[in-house]
Amino acid sequence: MAHVLFWRKFANSVKSGCVSRDLKAAGAIPGQAGGGINLPGYSRTGIRKSKTGRWRAAALIALNLFMIAHIIQWQIMGKTVSPIEPSETMYTLQNGFVNAGFIFFGLAILATLLFGRFVCGWGCHILALQDFCGWLLKKIGLHPKPFRSRLLVYVPLCAALYMFVWPVVYRIFSKPGHEPIIPKFTNHLVTTNFWATFPSVAVAIPFLFICGFVTVYFLGQKGFCTYACPYGGFFGLADKFSPGKIRVTPACNQCGHCTATCTSNVLVHAEVKQYGMVVDPGCMKCMDCVSVCPNDALYFGFGKSTLLAPKSNVIKRHYSLTWPEEIVGALVFLGSFLAVRGVYALVPFLMALGCAAVTTFLTLKTWRLLRARELSFYRFNLKSSGKLHKAGWVFVIFACAWIGLNMHCGWVRYHEFLGNVAFNKVHLPDEVALAQLDPARWLSPADRQNIIQGKEHYLAASRTGLFVNNEALPKLAWLEYLLGDAEQSVQTLGTAAARQKDESKALSLYYRGAILSRLGRYDEARATLDEALAERDDLILARQEKGEALWQLGRRDEAVSVWTDAVQRNASLVLANNELAGAQRLLGNLEQASVHEKQGDQFTPNNPFYHWVLGRRLQDLGMTELAEKHFQQAGQLSSSGTELPGQN
């Protein structure tokens, strides 16, 4: 009787295309647990191996090799095609820079509108990392389980709107009246600084590890795509309009092999039964489901889009969270994202999204672990009968370390943010502050308060931080100078310059050289300004300052040569023209002095502070006659009651 029931169950299962756990365990099916044999072309689960998997792996490997070749070509030739990265579109929308990333992103969206999300499945380096991680985990017997949330799936779309739509909206409502809504487009298809918009290698490595591996381990395959990728936000939206879908024929017997194989966490068998096609925008057209179908019932074809599919609630989706947990999870995600984004001026936007998704999972899982009597993760039993096992303690320790680091980043970011807010509220112009050694004596009460608060916040972030914020250091140095501590400011700027590169380093060196000149350390100032010009030869302000240092050292011919070079590069430089006029007058070249004086006057704004700054700088160089002229003009323009600093 038992044998009859067994084979009846087997026959019914074959008819329906499904095999029960009892039959699998009994070894009645080839390749299943408990016995049997493995048929060629089939995995141990009895599901046919995907033939497209290798083709897709080859495509993704080729993509990564192409990216490496792109970087090598740039290193060898010094210039190359701008990064083929969708994030470059931001610079097109904000500044009108037409680059390769913008063109690629536009074509990818158009392709998705027609064919669906093939670009995601076959042409994304982050997805390649996620698939590689999933493959490694399966090799050691760990099968990533999808983390399913109702609310967090909207994060990619929100991130996409923030990256690509918000800048346009902001430009429309905040642009000056003379600026067009759409910026003038310029050609930036070729670049000499390929890595300018990317994080450093030291940041890129943990970024790829978190977004390509950690997210898969905790959130399941395509975890980053599902809960963090902003480009996927637009691709998923475009997929709803696409006529290209995975579709089904009447040969389907609902075996479920397609769903079991899908690495995009799509309920393929249920959707094709209900709609005749896959409607989930998470489908990345990997084609594994088509390849493994034992009846060849699935295919890619064109027809009606998701928007035209009938509405239905038949398919019941099982989520990982209750609604209260969803709300808490959304708040945790937002808090974590704000805590880590930009902390230490290191963590980029996409990395912050990946970190926030993992933090959300760990927070909610830890909360459940503390409350539940039974809980497992992968094949590890974390807790049973209300008692934590060794694996549970390991999970709790890791989760607490991760969440604790996240909270620490939030504390540092809080001080960095408030420091930046205070810094941006200081209204004293740099030119006025550098006109004399001690600007602190004539700061407004509001400026003084903001400077003190900004310095306190930057120092608090520095004292408690694990890394140095190279962008905050120059700001701290400037606040120190404004408070009258020029010596400390010079030291801080030196520290900043030693840690910076390119334009940032050049600016720190420029300000350091300018402050050294105010301290009377002209030889050090000249050397520092030479370093700045070595980083950025086009930094005209550094040339002006270098000329002043040379003049103070008695090397007047060299000073005149430097100022002349600056004016030749930019004829509208008011200070350099006035310095040349004063120098030529002292050297007896009155005709040349008159030419430069007129040229300087042509571009001098009718602002009393501007004339006062010119007078002060010229007075320090011993060009008293020209200085007095500007002091008088400043006095005339300030007759309305504007209070100017003293001349001494």
Predicted regions and their residues:
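Non-ligating segments of multi-cofactor redox enzymes
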Residues: A2-G276, S291, D296-A440, N450-Q453
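Membrane-interface segments at or immediately adjacent to transmembrane helices
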Residues: M407-A498, E524
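Hydrophobic/aromatic packing residues within the alpha-helices of TPR/SEL1-like helical repeat arrays
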Residues: I451, Y458-L459, L493, L529, ...
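Helix-start (N-cap) detector for alpha-helical repeat units in TPR-like alpha-solenoids
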Residues: V412, N469-E471, E503-L507, I540-L541, ...
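Register position in tetratricopeptide repeats
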Residues: L482, R518, Q552-L553, L586-L587, ...
